[in-house]
């Protein structure tokens, strides 16, 4: 019999920049992700799962997330939530330069559920950090989101970035599920399983061969 996970819900950078600033989240739409973020937070509170809210700080001269600016502020629906712990960070990973790891250890947490923004940046950095530290990780793919990029390395739509990172996460770093599937797992006290790199690759090879 599997042991019930000791979860914490990590809400990453749900800040106004992604809603009304110059870097709007495009996929999934915030009309999808924000309600799921709020739903997950409320469900966590009801189930006794600690909720940790993370906010990114940038220098006052920064064009995005300048500390004290409107774009830096948490979205009102997240700001008003009575979180169990709050973290301000200056790097991608919510672990880097913060007390997150110590807080999780002091509360006996073995499973970290990641929601918020952006899939490929702060979510990814945090997921990799958590997985390498030995935590079980969950990623709610409809309570997160991203935006498009174009640079010397190439171009990618928001949908492409979100889909590819979700696929990679599930292959080796985090169980990728919907908010509804996560709610069911929380109610039932069950762990969520990720795939592995071998099977993920073999399925793709078989699909290509067909």
Regions found by a protein language model. Name each.
Residues 17-20, 147-149:
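Short acidic/His/Gly/Ser-rich catalytic and metal-binding motifs that mark active-site loops
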Residues 2-8, 35-42, 64-210:
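Active-site-adjacent betaalpha module
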Residues 5, 23-52:
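A short alpha/beta connector and helix-capping loop motif
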Residues 18-19, 52-57, 77-86:
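Short, basic/glycine-rich phosphate-binding loops at helix/coil junctions
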Residues 9-14:
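N-terminal nucleotide-binding beta1-loop-alpha1 segment
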Residues 23-30, 62-65, 154-155:
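Short glycine-enriched, charge-decorated loop/helix-capping segments at active-site entrances
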Residues 47-64:
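Short hydrophobic interaction/assembly module
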């Amino acid at each position: 019999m599997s042991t019930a996970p000791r979860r914490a819900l990590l809400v990453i950078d749900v800040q106004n920049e992604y809603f009304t600033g110059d870097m709007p989240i495009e996929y999934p739409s915030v009309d999808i992700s924000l309600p799921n973020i709020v739903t997950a937070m409320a469900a966590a509170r009801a189930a006794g799962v600690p909720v940790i809210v993370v906010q990114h700080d940038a220098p006052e001269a920064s064009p995005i997330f300048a500390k004290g600016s409107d774009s830096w502020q948490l979205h009102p629906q997240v700001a008003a939530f009575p979180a169990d712990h709050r973290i301000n960070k200056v790097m991608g990973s919510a672990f880097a330069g913060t007390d997150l790891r110590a807080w999780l250890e002091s509360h006996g947490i073995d499973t970290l559920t990641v929601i918020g923004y952006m899939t490929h940046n702060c979510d990814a950095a945090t997921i990799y950090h958590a997985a390498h530290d030995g935590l079980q990780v969950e990623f709610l793919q409809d309570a997160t989101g991203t935006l498009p990029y174009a640079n010397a390395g190439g171009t990618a739509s928001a949908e492409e970035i979100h889909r590819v990172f979700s696929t990679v996460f599930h292959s080796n770093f985090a169980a990728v599920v919907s908010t509804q599937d996560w709610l069911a797992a929380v109610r039932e006290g069950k762990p969520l399983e990720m795939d592995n790199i071998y099977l993920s690759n073999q399925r793709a090879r078989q699909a290509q061969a067909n």
